[in-house]
Structure formats: structure tokens, C-alpha cells
Amino acid sequence: FYLFCGLLAVFTESNVTLWPYGLSDREHTAQQDFNSTVLKEEKGDIDCRTLDSFGLTNIDFVKIDVDGFEVPLLNGARETLTNNNPVINIEMKRDKRAVVVTKCESILKDLGYKFQKRTKSDEVWLKS
């Protein structure tokens, strides 16, 4: 989080706001293993909230890369996605998480989204 805050400070004009929360289907504290994202193995607690709890509007694009937590994130974002109809770019590792991918596809289709394009492990979904 603080790395991104530092990077964002370089830009004098920005429409980006950073919050120190993980996204889920409910408010809770989760244990996170950071060894896949930093050079040394590290663990820590992350406060989680739903995307819907922020009451965001005018969202055009959502990028999701949460390594297996896509289903809780999408379930906690249903209202936001329905009200804003953003383009969704979601990392889906089909070779490693077939059950998660199937559930994500079901949620996205239920919300009126249609698969558009795949590049490596990222997929683009648009409101149909």
C-alpha cells in the first residue's frame, strides 16, 4: 500500500484514491501471505471491506488481480458493478483455479457481463 502511495505522490494531478483495505464479500480481517509479492516472506493482517461499502460512482474500469479471492471480491461488488457497468479486466488462472474461474464466470454473466478478450491470464468482460 505504501509503495503505491509513494508512486502516486509523484503525480501532481490524479483521479486515483488509495485505501488500505482488501476487498471481499464482507467486512473482516484476513491473514495475507505476502511472499508472492515481495522479496522476503512476510505475513500480515488486512482489513477487508466490500467494494459496495464505498458507494463509488462514475467507475469506468475495474482491474482485479487478487490471486484466488475473485469470488468474494465480485460478490461484494455486485451493486457497484450493476450501477456503474465498468469494463472489467480480471486475472483468471484457468490452468490453476478451474473452480474459481467457473464461479467468476457465473457471477459476471449473472450481472449481465459478456466475455470479450483474453490475453495471457487476463480477461476483459463488458456489460452486454
Kindly give the residue locations of the regions a language model identified.
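Phosphate/nucleotide-binding beta-alpha loop and adjacent structural elements of enzyme active sites
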Residues: 1-128
